[in-house]
Amino acid sequence: MKLLVFALCVVFEIGGVHAQTPDWQPSAGHTQIPIWPSTAPDAGPIAGPEVTTTVQDPGDPPATFVGRVSRPSMTVYSPKGTNTGAAVVVFPGGGYWVLFMDLEGTEVCDWLTSKGITCVLLKYRVPGENRFPRSGAYPKSPVALEDAQRTVGLVRFHAAEWGVDPHKIGVLGFSAGGHLVAAVSTNFKRRLYKAVDAADRESCRPDFGVALYPGHMMENTSRQFELNPYVPVTKETPPMFLLQAEDDPIDPVKNSLVYYYALKRAGVPVEMHLYAQGGHGFGLRPTTFPITGWPQLVETWLRTIGMIPK
């Protein structure tokens, strides 16, 4: 994914920059909602102020990413047409360094809301100095996972207000966001932070998960084909949908495979789709490969598991 490489160059101030602005803002009519009432837990050093950058590869539409996020927020997009009662929290990818807010965020929300699904776009913390998760003094707990746990609980807390069925709240993520899907789907019995309000009394277990070209699934292990211990799959892990291309140059397809086998061993319902070609970081944007039809597969799967009407 050339855009990710370029994004890292921007974060570390090496290479050209296109249309850089101070911070990301959603489209008119939508408002970012801070997910923490005050300072986020486990706040640590950041590389600098939040910055939003728009880049474009020749022949491709532009993509916007945000880096150095230290103040996480969510943006709620209401369903269009008939409300199915389902909600999806979307985690953009970007290697835990940046977040591709349109390619793997707002464009996904446009699709979900067109299907009658409430979309909650999470701008989770990517301070710009650490990957997720790693050993050492900082972060003591993975800040992105804290943000994900908090947001799932918030959606459940506001379910009646937002027209959401509290038993139909899922998560969907790309690349590093796909790893975050796996992390929050397997780390829900205990929050990694002290409760701050009534929303933290709600369950932070998603009812389903969709991980698209996930990465980081084999970190923190010395074996060649072993699941990251920070993704402790059990029979209580929610149903999962996995999709990846075998020619993915950023996150090898074994990231999906190792998670798939762990889910199967635990007896968790899982559907996986692998494609010979497709690369990495395509989001919903059309390509010349069959993998571009993945939204229809996810929609069918959601109907199959009873999250949206058949």
Which ranges hold each PLM region?
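Primarily recognizes the serine-hydrolase "nucleophile elbow" in alpha/beta-hydrolase
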Residues: 146-235
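Active-site glycine-rich loops that stabilize anionic/oxyanionic intermediates
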Residues: 92-97, 246
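Short beta-strand/loop motif that positions the catalytic acidic residue
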Residues: 242-244, 248
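Conserved alpha/beta-hydrolase "acid-adjacent" motif
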Residues: 249-255
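Short beta-strand-to-loop junctions in surface cap/lid or active-site-entrance loops
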Residues: 36-38, 74-83, 162, 230-234
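C-terminal catalytic histidine-bearing segment of alpha/beta-hydrolase fold enzymes
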Residues: 257-310
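Catalytic nucleophile-loop/oxyanion-hole region of alpha/beta-hydrolase
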Residues: 100-101, 107-108, 122-165, 286-291
